[in-house]
Amino acid sequence: EALYNSEDLYEETSDSDD
């Protein structure tokens, strides 16, 4: 989910920083 663009915080999201 693109709630947090910061992968630093949510790294569990997909590789897409969308």
Curated annotation (Swiss-Prot):
One GO-annotated biological process of the protein: defense response to fungus
Keyword line: Antimicrobial, Fungicide, Plant defense
Superkingdom, taxonomy of origin: Eukaryota
Physiological role: May possess antifungal activity against B.cinerea.
Protein's name according to its UniProt entry: Putative antimicrobial peptide 1
The species this protein was found in: Lippia sidoides
